[in-house]
Amino acid sequence: MFEIGFWELVLVAIIGIVVVGPKRLPEVVRTLGLLLRKMRRTISSVRADIERELDLEEMRKLMSDVDEPLKKHVDQLNQSIWQAEYDLRQGGKNLLKMIDEPPYQEPPPAAHSVQTDAEAYRDTGIEPADKSSSPEHHHDDAAR
């Protein structure tokens, strides 16, 4: 981490002896060692947190890339379901209307009535002859 060579360590030791004194130097070195270890742990912890955050950020980006098409498909499915539900409701309403309406009944067939000769002639537009002028009638009158 600190790429310190042999001569740099000798220089730091000489400065430490001059500043702190030979009696307190081992205690100061021990304290510096503890501080360096704590600093290294903190730095590695921060580094791990940053890497974890970067991984999380990548995962979020990946999820958002997957999420958009998935949302579109879900919206299309919802639209299809809503349309099917609407169609079913309309079909149900039409079915209920058909059930509520009376069924179509054909009008009863016209009664076949026997037409009299006069009615039949009237329908044709020809008038019947008098009974008195018919030959059968004359024959019956003469016989009497």
From Swiss-Prot:
InterPro entries referenced in this protein's UniProt entry, alphabetically: TatA/B/E, TatB
Compartment(s): Cell inner membrane
Main localization (coarse): membrane
A GO cellular component annotation in the UniProt record: TAT protein transport complex
Annotated region described as Disordered, given as residue ranges: 97-144
Entry GO MF terms: protein transmembrane transporter activity
Domain of life: Bacteria
Protein name: Sec-independent protein translocase protein TatB
Classification lineage: Bacteria, Pseudomonadati, Pseudomonadota, Gammaproteobacteria, Cardiobacteriales
Gene, per the UniProt record: tatB
